[in-house]
Amino acid sequence: PNTASYTYNTAIGGNNATVLTNTNVKGYAFSATGGFTLNSWHGLSGSAFYTFSEAKEVTANAGSSASSAWSGSLTVNSPNEQYKTLSNFSVPHRIVANLTYNIKNTSIGVYYSGANQGRFSYYYSNDVNGDGVANDLMYIPKSDAEIKFVNITSGSTVLFTAQQQLDAFNKFIRDNDLEKYRGKVVPRNGFLLPWNNRIDLRISQTLFNNMASKGDKVQISLDFINFGNLLNSKWGIQDYNVSSYGAAILSKSGSAATPDPSFTMLRDGSNLVSSPTRPASTTATTWTAMLGFKYSF
């Protein structure tokens, strides 16, 4: 089109357009579940099930608009690359179980759920390949000669030297099972968040089964959500990545066009990042208790 007919809208602040279309590369999803159910045995009932699943995709459409969906897909060369990888939502193993014991008017139920908490990728925090998009998967150098660090400074103060960062980076590779990717780009969504075990407990007591001979019932209940965390503050806590899309470990120094880039390691608080995840000890993941009252008529 004649570009003279298009003007920049300063009210919106946008100067580019993203056009999405269907890909010719097809993904797939597969899952299988097996288990057993205990209907009733001496007041006990329950079930246990295991699910295996696998899914591969070209993109997870990681965004709320066309532009962010396009640029949010981590890649090697360009967001326009169409290649199939494990889905961001592909959690391979999941176990769920429940066991309930009923005796007269009392019921005690235990519920368990165990699974990895998701997938993530290692990537650079900024644009490394010069395509204008900060979505580049991380390359693990074969040796120290393939990566160059620069000091991290604050004013005239050196916070971390280049050698300290190199040592920390090599330790990160060893500690997080990345040695096998030496000389390679890490796969997108190739890593699992830690396994999480969650146990819930419910105790209920029926006080009156037939109030005023009308069949009305009164029941009180006590629910412990994430009961394991009540027993041990480290149990049942979820983990999340140190970065929004996964684990950004390195940041490129200088402009995107630099042919021989230098890097700095990112920090987690006041220290150099040492793990791709951290525990999320918030009210959303710690234990809670609920007292319930139910009147049935």
Question: Which residues does each PLM region occupy?
Answer:
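Outer-membrane beta-barrel proteins
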Residues: 38-42, 103-108, 203-213, 218, ...
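Outer-membrane beta-barrel "beta-signal"
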Residues: 284-297
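Gly/Thr-rich phosphate-binding loop signature of adenosyl cofactor/nucleotide-binding cores
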Residues: 224-226
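Alpha-helical packing segments of well-folded alpha/beta enzyme cores
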Residues: 32, 95, 198-202, 289
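Aromatic-acidic/polar surface patches that form glycan- and anion
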Residues: 23-29, 37, 85-92, 185-197, ...
